[in-house]
Amino acid sequence: QADMSLRLGGGALRNQQDGLIFSQAGALEVQAGSLDNRQGTLQAQGDNRLRIGGALDNQGGRLDSRAGNLDLQSGSLDNGAGGVLNSAKGWLKLVTGLFDNSAGVTQAQSLEIRAGQGVRNQQGHLSALGGDNRIVTADFDNQGGGLYASGLLSLDGQRFLNQGAAAGQGGKVGAGRIDFSLAGALANRFGQLESESELHL
């Protein structure tokens, strides 16, 4: 097993425009002040662990773990414009400020997300394919987006915006069980919230 480690301290890592950093047999660990991975790929066969002090820009890029877990910490994370965060067989943990997943895909067997400045998931897809999806944040904007869990979907936040301008344009929420704890409003005009069993709002 050959692991790969990149430690740049407070420096910037630029891997944009079809850049590829790939740990073919083991884990990948990256520590940097910022990461520009627009249209780039950071991939590991094992665990993929990123510690980014500032902004992580993954617009149109891919952060991937094939057989391990995806463990992300950053000041902010922009996964918009077709960005992909994927842990095919393991969990994904994210600790960040603002998490922008607009028109992006974030998926793993289970998800744990802490985004202190909010989550934007407009037209995005955020899914726990085999287990729970646990989110702690401020406002969560899911207008036109999809938020899913095979098991429990737990959201602790301020407002949840799931509305649309017309039928079929609202957000979609689906899970085995849903447990929302909101300090603010839930807007669901033309939106869908579906639970296979329990639904707590």
Model regions: which residues?
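Short, T/G/N/S-enriched strand-turn elements that build extracellular solenoid repeat scaffolds
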Residues: 1, 16-22, 37-43, 58-64, ...
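Surface-exposed loop/turn motifs in large extracellular/passenger domains
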Residues: 1-12, 24-33, 44-53, 65-75, ...
